[in-house]
């Protein structure tokens, strides 16, 4: 289901900015590693807390770690190993867009997620 039917970039951006949380979850798709893709028969899955991902772009390129937190409002994920030090000297997780990561290992503890994979299979 498309969020908007307009072709104007400003309206596309506005629709993404104002999208409700249940539709924002669709923006969290990340590609799977080639091994997982063959195993599950799916190319992309939404990133969830507990998944192991590899960062493909940015300063933390090549870092592999578990997803610690998922922020639906900001459309960002937080990964172990992708940290920086803030002005107070505390270590904080660096926000990363889900499209810039590749899922290396999937947390299959949720039965609903298994149903999603079965539904999406090629």
Curated annotation (Swiss-Prot):
Any one of the GO CC terms: large ribosomal subunit
PROSITE patterns: RIBOSOMAL_L24 (PS01108)
Oxidoreductase among keywords: no
Keyword Acyltransferase: no
Transmembrane regions: none
Keywords: Ribonucleoprotein, Ribosomal protein, RNA-binding, rRNA-binding
A Gene Ontology molecular function term of the record: rRNA binding
An individual GO BP term: translation
Entry-linked CDD domains: KOW_RPL26
Signal peptide: none
Listed InterPro entries: KOW, Rib_uL2_dom2, Ribosomal_uL24_CS, Ribosomal_uL24_euk/arc, Ribosomal_uL24_KOW, Translation_prot_SH3-like_sf
Entries under PANTHER family matching the protein: 60S RIBOSOMAL PROTEIN L26 FAMILY MEMBER
Subunit structure comment from the entry: Part of the 50S ribosomal subunit.
Family recorded in the similarity comment: Belongs to the universal ribosomal protein uL24 family.
Cited HAMAP family: Ribosomal_uL24_A
Function according to Swiss-Prot or TrEMBL: One of two assembly initiator proteins, it binds directly to the 5'-end of the 23S rRNA, where it nucleates assembly of the 50S subunit. Located at the polypeptide exit tunnel on the outside of the subunit.
Protein's name in the database: Large ribosomal subunit protein uL24
Native source species: Pyrobaculum arsenaticum (strain DSM 13514 / JCM 11321 / PZ6)
